[in-house]
Amino acid sequence: MKTQRDGPSLGRWSLLLLLLGLTMPLAVIGRVLSYQEAVLRAVDGLNQRSSDANLYRLLNLDPRPTMDGDPDTPKPVSFTVKETVCPRTIQRSPEECDFKEDGLVKWCVGTVTLNQAKDSFDISCDKDKRKVARLGGILRKAGEKIGGGLKKIGQKIKDFFGKLAPRTES
């Protein structure tokens, strides 16, 4: 009497299961994140560590620098995040939240790794980019006022010399 053990199909199934078992961990370990995916994970980490009331969402990601092919090597990143309307206490993805009007904007720099198994990042963010924006607005307004004043002075000088020029009557 012939049993299933004696048949060739058991050997094939055993080999198939062995190969499947060996390749599955490699697929999980070897997953390489895209540059943007790694940054989004870093933003999630920042939200978890943050003591602010609301979640932050990626606002702008600076262009990807040229990188080597090793996903374990830390890659430099630079991006801005903006405060959303979602409280940090809810379990929601920041991408599902709207930006808060006049919300806090933070500029962040650091490094991320693209290897999902390592999933490491070292990011630091400035406290308030709005102060820089306000200073820029003040400087722009001051420049406009100074420019307007110089334009008036220039017109007066032009008028003065225009009056001094000899006039010829016809």
From Swiss-Prot:
<feature type="signal peptide">
    <location>
        <begin position="1"/>
        <end position="30"/>
    </location>
</feature>
<keyword id="KW-0964">Secreted</keyword>
<dbReference type="InterPro" id="IPR001894">
    <property type="entry name" value="Cathelicidin-like"/>
</dbReference>
<keyword id="KW-0165">Cleavage on pair of basic residues</keyword>
<feature type="disulfide bond">
    <location>
        <begin position="86"/>
        <end position="97"/>
    </location>
</feature>
<keyword id="KW-0391">Immunity</keyword>
<dbReference type="InterPro" id="IPR022746">
    <property type="entry name" value="Cathlecidin_C"/>
</dbReference>
<dbReference type="GO" id="GO:0005615">
    <property type="term" value="C:extracellular space"/>
</dbReference>
<comment type="similarity">
    <text>Belongs to the cathelicidin family.</text>
</comment>
<dbReference type="GO" id="GO:0050829">
    <property type="term" value="P:defense response to Gram-negative bacterium"/>
</dbReference>
<feature type="propeptide" description="Cathelin-like domain (CLD)">
    <location>
        <begin position="31"/>
        <end position="131"/>
    </location>
</feature>
<dbReference type="InterPro" id="IPR046350">
    <property type="entry name" value="Cystatin_sf"/>
</dbReference>
<feature type="disulfide bond">
    <location>
        <begin position="108"/>
        <end position="125"/>
    </location>
</feature>
<protein>
    <recommendedName>
        <fullName>Cathelicidin antimicrobial peptide</fullName>
    </recommendedName>
</protein>
<dbReference type="GO" id="GO:0031982">
    <property type="term" value="C:vesicle"/>
</dbReference>
<dbReference type="Pfam" id="PF12153">
    <property type="entry name" value="CAP18_C"/>
</dbReference>
<comment type="function">
    <text>Antimicrobial protein that is an integral component of the innate immune system. Binds to bacterial lipopolysaccharides (LPS). Acts via neutrophil N-formyl peptide receptors to enhance the release of CXCL2. Postsecretory processing generates multiple cathelicidin antimicrobial peptides with various lengths which act as a topical antimicrobial defense in sweat on skin. The unprocessed precursor form, cathelicidin antimicrobial peptide, inhibits the growth of Gram-negative E.coli and E.aerogenes with efficiencies comparable to that of the mature peptide LL-37 (in vitro).</text>
</comment>
<keyword id="KW-0399">Innate immunity</keyword>
<dbReference type="GO" id="GO:0001530">
    <property type="term" value="F:lipopolysaccharide binding"/>
</dbReference>
<keyword id="KW-1015">Disulfide bond</keyword>
<dbReference type="Pfam" id="PF00666">
    <property type="entry name" value="Cathelicidins"/>
</dbReference>
<dbReference type="GO" id="GO:0061844">
    <property type="term" value="P:antimicrobial humoral immune response mediated by antimicrobial peptide"/>
</dbReference>
<keyword id="KW-0044">Antibiotic</keyword>
<keyword id="KW-0929">Antimicrobial</keyword>
<feature type="region of interest" description="Active core">
    <location>
        <begin position="150"/>
        <end position="162"/>
    </location>
</feature>
<dbReference type="GO" id="GO:0050830">
    <property type="term" value="P:defense response to Gram-positive bacterium"/>
</dbReference>
<dbReference type="GO" id="GO:0042119">
    <property type="term" value="P:neutrophil activation"/>
</dbReference>
<dbReference type="GO" id="GO:0045087">
    <property type="term" value="P:innate immune response"/>
</dbReference>
<feature type="region of interest" description="Cathelin-like domain (CLD)">
    <location>
        <begin position="31"/>
        <end position="131"/>
    </location>
</feature>
<dbReference type="InterPro" id="IPR018216">
    <property type="entry name" value="Cathelicidin_CS"/>
</dbReference>
<keyword id="KW-0732">Signal</keyword>
